[in-house]
């Protein structure tokens, strides 16, 4: 990323130090804002402090041909957050972005896997190897605990109470929550931990990381690596659909709801701050019910 202007440097410090935003979130905000600032300076001859409602709308208009509505909405959300910060810092009397309307987004439902497809993926890792044991434990926690991939990568050895079957995760905004997991997840984790030391063979004992999940060099596993391994297992299963780590989380929530769990409990398990975010899963199960009805009822 190019060097940041002083205002964006201050905003980055605010995101990191005060809001506790993840590195991924901070990076996305800054990418959006650097692009917006470039537009203001080069096209409008304005600065971030002199940006106007019309300039923001004009910027979004330049994105309309080659950016999806969701991408434009994210750019606007970054701009709104930035100007809200400037107002709170008394650098501006009001936000020029406040009345800019977000692009209309098509209603999309979470991508959910049938139970049998989830189980097929879980059975793919070769549990005769330490990396296979690691991947099996990762997949079990993604589905058995509904963890975000960033939460899973951030797990340390002390974050799991194996006897109590509890995982302590650091969610969005540095919000900590406790997540119960099933016995199979714990068994998979214990099998991996019994051989985890093999991944530390090239590392001095005093340099051993606290990370739960390690790569073959002994470092903390990254979200990109996990997504790549999942792609491999999906191909081995001969599934035709694309499966992301987040699809395992969606499947966790939808299968819980289908099994009778109440929406408030699922909200807590997922770490959603808003119930409306969790309520998307009720629409998924309703559509599934409609499909069952249409295929099974003699009058359908």
From Swiss-Prot:
Keywords: Cell cycle, Cell division, Chromosome partition, Cytoplasm, DNA integration, DNA recombination, DNA-binding
GO CC list: cytoplasm
Species: Myxococcus xanthus (strain DK1622)
InterPro entries xrefs: CB (IPR044068), DNA_brk_join_enz (IPR011010), Integrase-like_cat_sf (IPR013762), Integrase_catalytic (IPR002104), Integrase_recombinase_N (IPR010998), Integrase_SAM-like_N (IPR004107), Tyrosine_recombinase_XerC/XerD (IPR023009), Tyrosine_recombinase_XerCD (IPR050090)
Subcellular location per the Swiss-Prot or TrEMBL entry: Cytoplasm
Record protein name field: Tyrosine recombinase XerC
Alphabetized HAMAP family for the sequence: Recomb_XerC_XerD
Domain Tyr recombinase: 108-294
Record GO biological process: cell division; chromosome segregation; DNA transposition
Superkingdom field: Bacteria
């Amino acid at each position: 990323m190019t060097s940041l202007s002083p205002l964006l440097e201050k905003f980055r410090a605010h995101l990191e130090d005060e809001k506790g935003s993840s590195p991924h979130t901070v990076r996305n905000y800054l990418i959006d804002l650097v692009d917006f600032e470039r537009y203001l300076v080069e096209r409008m001859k304005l600065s971030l402090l002199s940006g106007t409602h019309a300039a923001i709308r004009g910027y979004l208009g330049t994105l309309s041909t080659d950016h999806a509505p969701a991408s434009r909405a994210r750019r606007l959300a970054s701009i709104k957050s930035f100007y809200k910060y400037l107002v709170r810092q008394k650098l501006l009397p009001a936000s020029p972005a406040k009345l800019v309307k977000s692009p209309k987004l098509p209603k999309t439902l979470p991508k959910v896997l049938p139970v049998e497809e989830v189980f097929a993926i879980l059975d793919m890792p070769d549990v005769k190897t330490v990396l296979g044991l690691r991947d099996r434990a990762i997949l079990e926690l993604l589905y058995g605990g509904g963890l975000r991939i960033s939460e899973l990568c951030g797990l340390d050895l002390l974050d799991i109470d194996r006897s109590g079957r509890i995982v302590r995760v650091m969610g969005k905004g540095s919000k900590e929550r406790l997540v119960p997991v099933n016995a199979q997840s714990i068994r998979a984790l214990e099998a991996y931990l019994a051989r985890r030391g093999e991944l530390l063979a090239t590392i001095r004992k005093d340099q051993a990381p606290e990370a739960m999940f390690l790569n073959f060099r002994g470092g903390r596993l990254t979200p990109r690596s996990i997504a790549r391994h999942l792609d491999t297992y999906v191909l081995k299963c001969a599934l035709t659909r694309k499966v992301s780590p987040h699809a395992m989380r969606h499947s966790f929530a939808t299968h819980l709801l289908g099994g009778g769990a109440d929406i408030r409990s699922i909200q807590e398990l997922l770490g959603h701050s808003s119930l409306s975010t969790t309520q998307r899963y009720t629409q998924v199960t309703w559509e599934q019910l409609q499909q069952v009805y249409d295929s099974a009822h003699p009058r359908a």
